Amino acid sequence: MNQRLSPIKVEVKTEYIEAQSTPDEEKYLFSYTITIINLGDQDVTLKSRYWCITDANGQQSEVEGAGVVGETPTIKPNTAYQYTSGTVLETPFGVMEGNYTMIKSNGEEFKAPISAFSLAVPGLLH
């Protein structure tokens, strides 16, 4: 697998979903909206995802699977694909990071890294 710079840029926005969270039961729901931008010169298809989710207690969970939100999108050069998903933590703070396995139109497979981002109840961190 080629480990050169990825032609993919990943942007993340997160939101705490207070209405569906129950802190007394250690259930904190977060949504995250991901924008995947193809900066390369070929179509790329997202084949699978890998996430490592760590809560404030250091508990880690790994999530792997085909595509995202039931899709394996093909992203044309200089365009973007966006989706929203969510996760539940047992603590009011956590971190997610991972990668997407992508395939270029020429058949070359590569990993597009997703840098670590925070999930936090507003006002918790100063």
From Swiss-Prot:
Family matches, as InterPro entries: ApaG_domain, ApaG_sf, Uncharacterised_ApaG
Disulfide partners: none
PROSITE patterns: APAG
GO biological process, one term: error-free translesion synthesis
Superkingdom classification of source: Bacteria
Pfam families: DUF525
Location of the ApaG domain: 2-126
Spans through the membrane: none
PANTHER family listed in its UniProt record: F-BOX ONLY PROTEIN 3, POLYMERASE DELTA-INTERACTING PROTEIN 2
Protein name in the entry: Protein ApaG
Lineage: Bacteria, Pseudomonadati, Pseudomonadota, Gammaproteobacteria, Alteromonadales
